[in-house]
Amino acid sequence: MNLYDVIKKPVITESSMAQLEAGKYVFEVDTRAHKLLIKQAVEAAFEGVKVANVNTINVKPKAKRVGRYTGFTNKTKKAIITLTADSKAIELFGAEAE
């Protein structure tokens, strides 16, 4: 698996924005990715970033209805990335509109 295929997108929610102050960033990642691969992908994608810890969450599929038919959403995996104290911040999350 290519390192640039591991990270799919950032998770922008109220709780993930609250974790930014603690140096934690939340990404949706490939379901086959393990913690070491996620750490390598984040350090390769963002220059000057050092990862201290990676926590992963497997999100189960939810049942959805379309008319009379019931289906399921895709399962996903989220990774909470904790940076070291001497690491640069990831600018993707800190960009605020002025």
Swiss-Prot record:
Keyword ATP-binding assigned: no
InterPro entries recorded: Nucleotide-bd_a/b_plait_sf, Ribosomal_uL23-like, Ribosomal_uL23/eL15/eS24_sf, Ribosomal_uL23_CS
MF terms in GO: rRNA binding; structural constituent of ribosome
Any one cellular-component term (Gene Ontology): ribonucleoprotein complex
Keyword annotations: Ribonucleoprotein, Ribosomal protein, RNA-binding, rRNA-binding
Function: One of the early assembly proteins it binds 23S rRNA. One of the proteins that surrounds the polypeptide exit tunnel on the outside of the ribosome. Forms the main docking site for trigger factor binding to the ribosome.
NCBIfam families linked to this entry: PRK05738.2-1, PRK05738.2-4
Family classification: Belongs to the universal ribosomal protein uL23 family.
Annotated protein name in UniProt: Large ribosomal subunit protein uL23
Organism: Streptococcus gordonii (strain Challis / ATCC 35105 / BCRC 15272 / CH1 / DL1 / V288)
Source organism phylogeny: Bacteria, Bacillati, Bacillota, Bacilli, Lactobacillales
Gene transcribed to yield this protein: rplW
